[in-house]
């Protein structure tokens, strides 16, 4: 079995954390007896400096013709003053659109060794492990009309039936794989007609999955419940705006953005990346936490390659390294020894 992966390290700490993730990828390939082909391309500011474009046709074509894309990070101070449509973030939106990535998956998983790193009490967060499915291409971020003038501003939240159906179906299918995990659909159906539509469609899709429990929850209550009792959630499915906010709230339960992977999924393509930024202030200093990018590789094996046993090995190796006391600066408590990017990577590879 050969997996064809496109690596786009990007900017800032991106090349460092992607290098660590590829070390882990090679380790699991050797253990499980499959081959990987990794093709590297420039993206973001790194591409702009060489080609005058944040996303070249060559890079985009490579991403369309691989099994999965692994992204490091994009952006930085150097490119902040470029026109909006030339910035790295615009290139990220373009690649998501071109690849048809309609679902963003963000896990909220608290590792036992890092329970104390959360700002919440241990008894509240210990055992937390849920997945947020955020619709990525519809909703208020893309609806028309939109704009503002001197007296008012306006945006439009719109969802098509197919957009709600496909994200709901993806969430229910994932819940099946997790032993018929409970699905919580989050909306604002008490005041928004588009949320009433969302709820109706989710319930229609649920009829194909009668063995799965479905719970409806208003977004304001959900924000409170994620902090009050995060263990009640197993799978969350929600719209673009609500998912944008809730996934960040959920992520901080874990204690550091450096721990959090993500996946953007489409019908034919998928892109995996850490949720942290490019952190130009520590770039090139061997200080970055590679765990989010390494865990993104685990998500790749779960979702794109249907190899949960490979993903489980990666998660276990991460847990083992943390249990052994390895800590990068972002997750180290006062007085704890700080590991470099390469030291943390080596500790995880050794436990594959």
Curated annotation (Swiss-Prot):
Q: Which residues bind NAD(+)?
A: 76-89, 277-289
Its Gene Ontology cellular component terms are: cytosol
> Is the NAD keyword given for this protein?
yes
> PROSITE patterns, from UniProt?
IDH_IMDH (PS00470)
MF term (GO), any: 3-isopropylmalate dehydrogenase activity
Instruction: Indicate the family of this protein.
Output: Belongs to the isocitrate and isopropylmalate dehydrogenases family. LeuB type 1 subfamily.
Q: Which Pfam families match?
A: Iso_dh
**Which named protein is this?**
3-isopropylmalate dehydrogenase
Q: Which residues bind Mg(2+)?
A: 220, 244, 248
Gene3D superfamilies attached here? Isopropylmalate Dehydrogenase
Assembly information from the UniProt record: Homodimer.
HAMAP family named in the record:
LeuB_type1
Function field: Catalyzes the oxidation of 3-carboxy-2-hydroxy-4-methylpentanoate (3-isopropylmalate) to 3-carboxy-4-methyl-2-oxopentanoate. The product decarboxylates to 4-methyl-2 oxopentanoate.
Per its UniProt record, the required cofactor names are:
Mg(2+); Mn(2+)
**Keywords per UniProt:** Amino-acid biosynthesis, Branched-chain amino acid biosynthesis, Cytoplasm, Leucine biosynthesis, Magnesium, Manganese, Metal-binding, NAD, Oxidoreductase
Give the cofactor note: Binds 1 Mg(2+) or Mn(2+) ion per subunit.
């Amino acid at each position: 079995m050969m997996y064809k992966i496109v690596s786009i390290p990007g900017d800032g700490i991106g090349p460092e954390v992607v290098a660590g993730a590829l070390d882990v990828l090679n380790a699991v390939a050797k253990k499980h007896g499959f081959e990987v082909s990794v093709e590297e391309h420039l993206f973001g500011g790194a591409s702009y400096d060489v080609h005058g474009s944040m996303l070249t046709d060559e890079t985009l074509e490579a991403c369309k013709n691989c099994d999965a894309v692994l992204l490091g990070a994009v952006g930085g101070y150097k490119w902040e003053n470029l026109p909006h449509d030339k910035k790295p973030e615009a290139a990220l939106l373009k690649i998501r659109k071109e690849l048809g990535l309609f679902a963003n998956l963000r896990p909220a998983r608290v590792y036992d060794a890092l329970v104390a790193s959360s700002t919440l009490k241990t008894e509240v967060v210990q055992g937390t492990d849920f997945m947020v499915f955020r619709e990525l291409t519809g909703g208020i971020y893309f609806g028309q009309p939109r704009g503002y003038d001197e007296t008012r501003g306006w945006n439009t939240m719109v969802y098509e039936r197919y957009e709600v159906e496909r994200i709901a179906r993806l969430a229910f299918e994932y819940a099946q794989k997790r032993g018929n995990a409970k699905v919580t659909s989050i909306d604002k159906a008490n005041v928004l007609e588009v949320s009433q539509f969302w709820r109706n469609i989710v319930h229609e899709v649920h009829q194909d999955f009668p063995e799965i429990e479905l719970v409806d929850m208003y977004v304001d209550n959900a924000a409170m419940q994620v902090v009050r009792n995060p263990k009640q959630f197993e799978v969350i499915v929600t719209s673009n705006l609500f998912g944008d906010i809730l996934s960040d709230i959920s992520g901080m339960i874990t204690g550091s953005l450096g721990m959090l992977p993500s996946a953007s999924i489409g019908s034919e393509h998928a892109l995996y990346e850490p949720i942290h930024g490019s952190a130009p202030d520590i770039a090139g200093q061997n200080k970055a936490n590679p765990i989010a990018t390494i865990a993104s590789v685990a998500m790749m094996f779960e979702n794109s390659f249907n190899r949960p046993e490979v993903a489980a090995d990666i998660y276990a190796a991460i847990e083992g390294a943390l249990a052994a006391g390895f800590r990068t600066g972002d997750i180290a408590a006062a007085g704890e020894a700080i590991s470099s990017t390469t030291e943390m990577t080596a500790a995880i590879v050794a436990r594959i």
